[in-house]
Amino acid sequence: MKANWKKLRKNIPNRVRTKSRTHYEVLWSDEFHFDEKTGKKTYGTTRFDPNLITLNINQGDKETMHTYWHEFIHALSEDYQLNLTETQVENLELSFLYVREFILTLEGKKK
């Protein structure tokens, strides 16, 4: 099943839950900069006090979804004390499209 990136991006919620009583507010911003520590441009952030995921509003649909998944994984790593490295987060991010397909198959929405 091919992803409809535009539809997926449109469905990003304003608030997402990682545990039964843990939520992250999801915000959009155009104020992202080059990260001198990593040497990469920043497209999203995850904060833990308060719980907040911020996404770059100026990305394309597919890039936005990957950033959203990436930041959500950072939140999961924190909330479940997984201590994932950035490389591990990046690798898990790449798997989310397949996890989505797996769930759709279980729900009978994909054959």
Regions found by a protein language model. Give the residues of each.
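Short intrinsically disordered terminal tails
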Residues: 1-2, 107-111
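Active-site scaffold of zinc-dependent metalloenzymes
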Residues: 5-62, 78-100, 111
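Short secondary-structure capping/junction motifs at helix and strand boundaries
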Residues: 101-105
